[in-house]
Amino acid sequence: MLMDFAKHRTSGAATPREIAQRLSRSRRDFLRDAAGVALGSSLLGASPFLRGEAAAKKRKMIVVTFGGGARDQETFAPEGQENIPYMLRELIPQSSFFTQVTNQGILGHYVATASLATGVYETLNNFSAIAPEHPTVFEYFRKDLKRPSSDAWVVAPSNGFNRIGESESRSYGPGLGARVVLPKHLLSAASSGALKDYQHLVRDNYETPLYTPQIGGGEFELQQLEMILKLSVDDFMAHARTVSSPDELSMYIVKRLMQEESPSLLWITMHDIDIAHSGTYSLYVDAIRRTDRLCAELWKTVQSEPEYAGNTTLFILPDFGRDADEDPGGNGFQHHRTGDAASRTTWMMALGAGVRQGVVYDRPMQSIDLVPSLGAMMGFSPALSQGKPIKELL
């Protein structure tokens, strides 16, 4: 019998840990019913992941994070399943799904994503264009495995993420980070700053109008277009006119990167769902549906690109959740400011090479466990990370 979704909603008598466990169990039971997945055990045998030096050289990882997360009411619940048809029908049946991933850090999109990328709960100012304090996964990957800069990329829709690829760490830092593509900067450069017809693609921050980073873009971005992405200005602008959101533009850039550069470590941040801060419920739901579709499109691209098919693991996870309806300090779907269990307890799915298919795990883990897991799977050591490798993936 499917657990009544209402049972996991917050109450004054429940502790944050109890609420997190209820959320996890509710997601688990819903997915077992709706997607036909089985309850997994950490006592399973070794992962089917390919081992050996030759396999490691071909191994690729793609991480998709999306800003703000979405409530279970609009996703992993009977009343929300219509918004995630691709996840339920195509992605989750092929994945290992983790229902209780907690974020114990600061619930701001840049700082939370930086924490995901370093494996340490960063404490930087969420609205400052500064690099993470601790080494990023890209630096560990490139230094330990002696990989070139072309093998690690970040595609980020928000201008505030331009420092995400490289830390301030003296042991790593300068010259060892990922290359970062900001599609809004590409658009600004290609249009010579004439963005009047592209306002729906350059809106940068939904959370506070007081923080509006300048939309940059110049000769460097034009070189990225022409030399790396093999796109003419005319072709790029023509495609920009066909997309409806920043994340759609980002996914177009991602596909070009996969075709032209084929990086072994590719990190994508998506941000459309954070339009929830506008307070318009219909736009929030539309963004969930768009994100669901774009994730499925990315997985199809992975399977169709010769450099990625059969040797790629895809991770999809929100940076954190959203406030619960019942929390008097929040505003339901609109924000993530209370720090309650609903805003901190999210999920992750992994699918592709080496991942057990159609399995759901409900034990607690933390979002900072991602980087140590990537290191264990790819063969590098994230020495300063504070998370733990996810044993179900190893």
Which residues does each predicted region cover?
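Histidine-centered active-site microenvironments of extracellular/periplasmic hydrolases
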Residues: L317-L351
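N-terminal export leaders
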Residues: R25-L44
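Non-catalytic, well-ordered alpha-helical segments in soluble enzyme domains
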Residues: F138-R142, R363-E392
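Active-site His/acidic residue clusters
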Residues: P78, S167-E168, K230-A238, M251-E297, ...
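Short, structured active-site-proximal loop/turn typified by the sulfatase FGly-forming signature C/S-X-P-X-R
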Residues: E74-V111, D151-W153, Y361
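N-terminal secretory signal peptides
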Residues: M1-S26
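A contiguous, mid-domain pocket- or channel-lining segment that forms the substrate-recognition surface
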Residues: F127-I130, P135-A238, P246
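Active-site-proximal N-terminal segment of extracellular/periplasmic enzymes that hydrolyze or transfer
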Residues: A20, A38, L43-S95
